[in-house]
Amino acid sequence: MRIREANPEDAEALAWLSGQLGYPATAEATARRLREIIAHPVGAVYVAEMRDRTIAGTAHVLAEYSMMDEPGAYLAGLIVDESCRSQGIGSALLRAAETWAREHGLTRMRVNSNVIRERAHRFYLREGYVENKRQAVFFKPLT
């Protein structure tokens, strides 16, 4: 396995992974989003590419700037293919995201995880993260 930055050719695999986590997306929409991320580099998207060149996971990290805290990083997504979990892929992707954050002078990493994803919570705790708070999330379309 190797961890590398994602590119638009990974869109189909990234859409598949996103769907596994309950966020269905088309390859076209995923490719468009990835091109936007690459064009506006406030973060990075990594993939775990297996020896057979299949994509087994992805991580998306962003820089966060706030008046309330020092600059930090936000792990916007971490997905490992259901058939490949518990093989160290998530840990490797998380390390890549943390390395990106450190290289960009960021001193902390924030992760949100749905309250029903208890397996993910155990993973983050094992990786040294601590639960900070639980909160409601609000959304409003702007179009």
Language-model features, listed with the residues they occupy:
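Conserved acetyl-CoA-binding loop of GNAT-fold acetyltransferases
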Residues: L125-R134
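Extreme N-terminal starter segment of soluble prokaryotic enzymes
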Residues: M1-R2
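Conserved beta-strand-loop-alpha-helix junction that forms the acyl-donor binding cleft
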Residues: V111-A120, F139-L142
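Acetyl-CoA-dependent GNAT
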Residues: E5-P71, A76, L94-R95, N132
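Conserved GNAT acetyl-CoA-binding A-motif
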Residues: L94, A101-S113
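Hydrophobic adenine-recognition pocket in adenosine-nucleotide-binding enzymes
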Residues: A6, L78-V80, S113
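Conserved acetyl-CoA-binding loop-helix of GNAT-fold acetyltransferases
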Residues: V80, S86-T99, R122, R126
